[in-house]
Amino acid sequence: MSQARPATLRVAVLGAGSWGTALAAAASRRHPTVLWARDGAQAQAMAARHENTRYLPGVALPPALQVSADLAQALAHLAHDPAHALIILGVPVAGMTPLCTELAARLPALGLQAVPLVWTCKGFEEQTAHLPHETVQAALGAMPGLAAGVLSGPSFAREVAQGLPVALTVASESSAVRDAVTTALHGAAVRIYASTDVVGVEVGGALKNVIAVACGICDGLALGTNARAALITRGLAEMARFGAALGAQQETFAGLTGLGDLVLTATGELSRNRRVGLEIGAGRKLADILASGMTAEGVRCARAARDRARALNIELPITEAVCAVLFEGLSPMTAVSALLAREARPESPTP
């Protein structure tokens, strides 16, 4: 780290879904932490029961964790010592623009515009095909002193909330962001690695969800572990090609936020993206799966990833196949056959 930070930070986690709650729980074990929930009833129930029954039922939250539905109160927690504070955005991609727009109005008024800020969402914004850092830049880029980055890696929220071991990467051009996240979370069961490759970390986090849907489809069709291994490996090549076109560092894709996150999401039993793929492979329609309440970022961002890749003339055959199955009525087996029928070529895991 570039310089020592104090042992104690004030942390505000904005967004009380499963991942926001898990990170707030981890931070609150060592630092004064406030978790902001947009839903007042949810916040009240969490504060009373020390449990997020909606997103992490059965997981006890640390008694020291404060929960509030008042965004002003959550930010005021930081204003007591803005030089030693951290903001973690725990909302999904779809919630980034509204929240960042609100923060653009609130942070300068409280003197918090230079507080290190990280987001944790993975994917592309459906309407714009923006990666999260582009959304943040559009909403907060004019704010003086902005220091921002992304926190990502192979992690299921439930395990993090339970205090089980996890390794994550914080990526930012700002050493203040990297240092603040490390101070807030590194230690005990959480290991933090630092990077400057924001784009590479985000591309890995976005595309691994799409590849995980493909792996779930493969498993749902009972095509075997050989086929799954091929999808993971060639999916990693797609991630690297896409990242290279956007200026990412290739070594990022061999790390936690590339290969690590892809393997976890493509094979883990807690992976929602894999579960959606399993259902598709078993013959269920996407509309029925979504109507049952199952959600997955891979479904939300697949089309945006495909469209942005096409605009950049990047070949993403697995992503194209997933989109054809999800949105164009192509049968899963036909998609597999089309992938297998592609022309033979030399293996090139990197661009």
UniProtKB/Swiss-Prot annotation:
Residues binding NADPH, per UniProt: S18, W19, R38, K122, A157, R272, E297
Keywords: Cytoplasm, Lipid biosynthesis, Lipid metabolism, NAD, NADP, Nucleotide-binding, Oxidoreductase, Phospholipid biosynthesis, Phospholipid metabolism
UniProt catalytic activity: sn-glycerol 3-phosphate + NAD(+) = dihydroxyacetone phosphate + NADH + H(+); sn-glycerol 3-phosphate + NADP(+) = dihydroxyacetone phosphate + NADPH + H(+)
GO cellular component labels: cytosol
BP terms from Gene Ontology: carbohydrate metabolic process; glycerol-3-phosphate biosynthetic process; glycerol-3-phosphate catabolic process; glycerophospholipid metabolic process; phospholipid biosynthetic process
Protein EC: 1.1.1.94
Class in the EC hierarchy, top level: oxidoreductase
Subcellular localization(s) per the UniProt record: Cytoplasm
Active site (catalytic residues): K208 (proton acceptor)
Pfam families cross-referenced by the UniProt entry: NAD_Gly3P_dh_C, NAD_Gly3P_dh_N
GO-annotated molecular function: glycerol-3-phosphate dehydrogenase [NAD(P)+] activity; NAD binding
Role summary: Catalyzes the reduction of the glycolytic intermediate dihydroxyacetone phosphate (DHAP) to sn-glycerol 3-phosphate (G3P), the key precursor for phospholipid synthesis.
Family: Belongs to the NAD-dependent glycerol-3-phosphate dehydrogenase family.
Entries under PANTHER family matching the protein: GLYCEROL-3-PHOSPHATE DEHYDROGENASE, GLYCEROL-3-PHOSPHATE DEHYDROGENASE [NAD(+)] 2, CHLOROPLASTIC
Protein name stated in the entry: Glycerol-3-phosphate dehydrogenase [NAD(P)+]
